[in-house]
Amino acid sequence: MSEEFELDTDDLKRRMDGAMANLKTEFASLRTGRASASMLEPVMVDAYGSMTPINQVGTVNVPEPRMVTINVWDKGLVGKVEKAIRESGLGINPQLNGTIIMLPIPELNEERRRELTKVAGQYAEHARVSIRNVRRDGMDQIKKAKADGMSEDDQKFWETEVQELTDKMIKAVDAALETKQAEIMQV
């Protein structure tokens, strides 16, 4: 009989949480027709010789549901920030007002909303696959321990623990997807 097997469920949970955090980051990059400061996170500006996130060259605000403003701290960077936004692929047309760049967020049409819900679904499926891969790793560890002499009861206990953790995380992914799809389809 081997010594007592102890599965590191904290490691499995941490890895599953990582998949969930990645999903939330991907969801934040989807434009929903509502203004949000996070929609500019992937946009980088060539400032002072290096690529810099927009929130490090100015203050990003959301004064209205369909407007984002950026108050650029250095007047010399206003043109570069505007260019970075135009070239970002967000489909936003910046308007200059001194050192303030205004970004009116256009209304999404029905077809684009449906496309975005499909993309959100793909992101969620990638997260589910990542979570299932972590589950498989945990189950493989349990099988290895079983081969090394783990009792049948211990095997069932650990398999149940891993499955319950997986089910909980998959439900969280599904809930996040449902929320994001409702947000995208909201006119």
Swiss-Prot record:
Q: Which top-rank group of organisms is this from?
A: Bacteria
Is this entry keyworded Magnesium? Answer: no
Locate the transmembrane regions by residue number. Answer: none
Question: Does the record carry Protein biosynthesis as a key word?
Answer: yes
- Record keywords: Cytoplasm, Protein biosynthesis
Assigned GO CC terms:
cytosol
User: Where does it reside?
Assistant: Cytoplasm
Drop me one GO molecular function for this one.
Answer: ribosomal large subunit binding
Xref: Gene3D superfamilies = 3.30.1360.40, Ribosome-recycling factor
Can you supply a Gene Ontology BP term from the record?
A: cytoplasmic translational termination
One short Pfam family name for this protein? RRF
**What's the stated role of this polypeptide?**
Responsible for the release of ribosomes from messenger RNA at the termination of protein biosynthesis. May increase the efficiency of translation by recycling ribosomes from one round of translation to another.
The Swiss-Prot or TrEMBL record describes its family as follows:
Belongs to the RRF family.
Protein's recorded name: Ribosome-recycling factor
- Biological classification of the source: Bacteria, Pseudomonadati, Pseudomonadota, Alphaproteobacteria, Rhodobacterales
